[in-house]
């Protein structure tokens, strides 16, 4: 795997053990250019960084060594874990994001991401379900990598799970829609909601799930399709 090196000083100085790396978190840069993104990831005042950046041409740039904690996840939760920075590798894909003109990720970019993920998965024994998006672990704050990110394609390489297009679910299991849906999400690893009581976080969490698994249907509402997908993923 070919990669360039352009190191940032934005990382926690203490070296972490290889066994502590359990997740890969995928982001988009959300800035107007590659140069602007790199400058921000290297600026000490920004207090943000990533381990790898992949540009539109598919070049992989290492910005923080794997054994250091980069500052990419921020306030985050997934299953029993909080502050996913400590346990993850952060990958930024150059993309203008929703603020500046959200783009389809380039073929070269995704091909390089797959190569990088294969290497990381093998090196750190990362489980298939532990390839996540920033919005999965921080749904109240973040929406990246967004609905144009090809999670279905990545799942075919065993990076993240997907659902079968023709699956059936027992109707009885779909009664009490909201509670069933959030129980399913809790089992998957999502947090920031109350299974038994509606709150103001619900819509953002639903949208986060839809951006990943139902990208043409990001409504923030629990419709039949969204509910069925959540159930399939929770039981498989």
Give, region by region, the residue ranges found by the protein language model:
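Active-site-adjacent loop/helix surface patches within enzyme catalytic domains
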Residues: 1-129
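N-terminal secretory targeting signals
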Residues: 1-5, 228, 232-236
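A sequence-composition feature that detects small, non-aromatic residues
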Residues: 70-73, 138, 234
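Basic/polar, cationic surfaces and motifs that engage anionic cell-wall
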Residues: 97, 102-193, 204, 208-218, ...
């Amino acid at each position: 795997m070919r990669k360039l090196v352009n190191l940032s000083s934005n990382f926690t100085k203490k070296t972490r053990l290889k066994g502590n790396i359990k997740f890969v978190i995928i982001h988009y840069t959300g800035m107007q250019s590659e140069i602007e993104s790199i400058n921000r990831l290297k600026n000490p005042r920004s207090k943000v960084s990533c381990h790898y950046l992949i540009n539109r041409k598919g070049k992989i740039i290492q910005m923080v060594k794997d054994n250091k904690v980069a500052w990419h996840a921020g306030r985050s939760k997934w299953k029993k874990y909080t502050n996913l920075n400590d346990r993850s590798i952060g990958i930024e894909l150059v993309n203008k994001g929703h603020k500046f003109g959200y783009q389809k990720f380039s073929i070269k970019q995704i091909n390089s991401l797959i190569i990088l993920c294969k290497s990381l998965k093998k090196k750190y024994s990362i489980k298939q379900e532990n390839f996540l998006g920033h919005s999965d672990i921080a749904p109240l704050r973040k929406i990246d990598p967004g609905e144009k990110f090809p999670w279905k394609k990545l799942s075919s390489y065993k990076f993240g799970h997907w659902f079968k297009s023709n699956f059936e679910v027992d109707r009885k299991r779909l009664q009490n829609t909201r509670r069933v849906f959030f129980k399913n999400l809790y089992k998957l690893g999502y947090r920031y909601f109350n299974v038994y009581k509606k709150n103001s976080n619900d819509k953002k969490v639903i949208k986060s799930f839809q951006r990943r698994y139902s990208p043409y249907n990001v409504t923030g509402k629990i419709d039949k399709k969204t509910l069925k997908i959540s159930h399939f993923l929770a039981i498989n």
